[in-house]
Amino acid sequence: MFTGIIEEIGTVKQIRQGTASAVLNIRAERVLEGTKVGDSIAVNGICLTVTSLFPDAFTADVMHETLNRAAMSGLACQKRVNLERAMQINGRFNGHMVAGHIDGTGKIIHIHRDDTAVWFTIQTKPEIMRYIVEKGSVAIDGISLTAVNI
């Protein structure tokens, strides 16, 4: 489980395509602290398992279906990604509970900035909208947001 509070913005160093999956190599610093092989890190909100660690990066396998269905379809080298380690039972809980399993994708169709906030209008399919409630939480690229107007 994750909280939707991004710890760090990492950078995709390499994507190696395999027959059934791809291996992502992601440059990071903060999320590597205390992380072990087998731990979970959310990459743009998608729960991935760390398969190897380096001083400045980690790798994770991603199934092709995940790459094609989720917001990772446009992933490329040098792209920046939101990173968050799995929440700890004894840690602070901000944001909301984020499983790291993607229900669907949407498209930002309008952005409005005012003195206190940035407002996004996001369009998605009706089968996704039925799960979104006014004043409820939603994770966009792993970021915990509140749905204001439906």
Predicted ranges, named:
Residues 1-150:
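Conserved loop->alpha-helix
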